[in-house]
Amino acid sequence: MPQLLPDDVIWIHDYHLIPLAAELRAMGCTNRIGFFLHIPLPPPLILAAIPAHDWLMRALFAYDLVGFQSEADLTHFTRYIQSEAHAEDLGQGRWRAFSRTLTAGAFPIGIDVEEFAGLTAAPEGRDMYQRMRDEYSRRKLLVGVDRLDYSKGLPQRLRAFRELLQRYPENNNSATLIQIASPSRETVHAYGDILRERESLCGSINRAFGDLDWMPVRYMHRTVARKKLPGLYRAGRVALVTPLRDGMNLVAKEFLVAQDPA
């Protein structure tokens, strides 16, 4: 720990690193350490079914401040530590268990509205909007922007779009789904399986319903520059945000900000 100064504050992010504070404490670190969980926390009954759940919760008490994305997640945490660790409520978000005291709170995140609105009005945003409008002037655009992750519900979204085309054929040739799936954890084998499943679904939909001048699903497995995203959002009639389980999804907020106020 030679890089640490006595008054440094350490901020740890996400579940992969829950044990880090306990390891630092074992090495003699006395700095203030905070932790923020970027995923939903399960209810106590489900949490208690996780192997070594008590070890994980004990590790969280090595932090001084623990943050969650929502009040529901915070409630799950406090209910768990009360029932499983007999934590003492000290008031004002402070809890004592495992011979340590921490502060727990909910800190929902948002977006910088002015900054994103500025991107919408910037040349790159306007150019992307115009390109989309020119290319898809005859069709309604549905837009999805996600990381390639099993929690985002992408197969279910694609199947729902296929169901729309099957049940309401009048929408054929009049609606296009643009789905961006940014690469994520490509070295993990399971994520390669996810990618192949998505590509297979998109291919089957396009083969079943596509025409010479219409591709129902335009699927892009790449990252789109942030400066261009507002133009894509603004061109869309509908944004599809369909996670199976998610934290604070910012796509819905960005989509609203990107719309033309007129």
What would you call each of these model-derived segments?
Residues 1-262:
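Catalytic cores of carbohydrate-active enzymes across secretory and cytosolic contexts
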